[in-house]
Amino acid sequence: TTGVGLPLDGPSGNVPTPHPAGSPNGYQPPYVAPELVTRDYGPISTMDPWLPANATRTEGNNTFAYIDVARPNGFGTGDVAPTPNGDPDGGIAFDRVYDPLQNPYANDSQRMAAATQLFYDINFLHDWYYDRGFDERSGNAQTSNLGRGGIENDPINAEGQDNSGR
């Protein structure tokens, strides 16, 4: 991440992708070790939290991020939603590390890491665009608009590894 928490392009940071030559030549970008980002909300003037205090999975006011590996489409039996795995300060932590050397479908640890990153990215972008004018009245996706107008109950269902075939 950068100083404001802006997500990096990928596990290689913001180096040229896919590679500087623009054609296959054996270039391998350097791996950037992940860091645990601690924040309750992104770059947003309202300081609305991403998760309720009693959160049990990556589901908040703006998005529900999960891995949709089982039919039917949408979250259900067999799908994976990251659960908190502790925080030494007593808050909520989703401390998941994605291993780029493993298959993304290898195990639930890989899936939880991917969905945790998806949750972070969606929430960060929600907050980033909010203060640039994409608020409730403009159609910003939220479960509760907190009395600020617009249509409620329209959070983003962010499905990683979506099984719908699209």
Language model features with spans:
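Extracellular zinc-dependent metalloprotease catalytic-domain scaffold
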Residues: 1-166
